Amino acid sequence: MNLIQILEQEEIARLNKTIPSFAPGDTVIVNVNVVEGTRKRVQAYEGVVIAKRNRGLNSGFTVRKISSGEGVERTFQTYSPLIASIEVKRRGDVRRAKLYYLRERSGKSARIKEKLPSRVKAAAVAA
């Protein structure tokens, strides 16, 4: 590992953010700190992760949602101080890393199947 990677890992450890593991296709709720004048509030942004970019400290992900009939995409930096928290609402079962094809789809064709826990794991947890 080179010096830059070591520095990035130290910076990530210093930030001390708990980021859940999520993948493209998952529905997430991103709580964003919004500053309006002197007021600071938390705004929830819920949508489907259509892309994820793993670059250490520069990692990011794109979330797409439908707001009043119009598709809205927002790209977040994973370790940004503007992100208060990330919560995974549901896991999606997809076969692609980038789900840009969802931009052209609407309605039922834009649905993503839910990834159910495997029966082997469920049986092991129950036992």
Curated annotation (Swiss-Prot):
Keyword Nucleotidyltransferase in record: no
NCBIfam families per record: rplS_bact (TIGR01024)
Role: This protein is located at the 30S-50S ribosomal subunit interface and may play a role in the structure and function of the aminoacyl-tRNA binding site.
UniProt-listed InterPro entries: Ribosomal_bL19 (IPR001857), Ribosomal_bL19_CS (IPR018257), Ribosomal_bL19_sf (IPR038657), Translation_prot_SH3-like_sf (IPR008991)
UniProt keyword annotations, A-Z: Ribonucleoprotein, Ribosomal protein
One cellular component (GO) term of this entry: cytosolic large ribosomal subunit
Protein name: Large ribosomal subunit protein bL19
Organism field: Acidovorax ebreus (strain TPSY) (Diaphorobacter sp. (strain TPSY))
Organism domain of life: Bacteria
GO biological process: translation
Molecular function GO terms recorded: structural constituent of ribosome
Pfam assignment, any one: Ribosomal_L19
Annotated SUPFAM superfamilies: Translation proteins SH3-like domain
Entry's family note: Belongs to the bacterial ribosomal protein bL19 family.
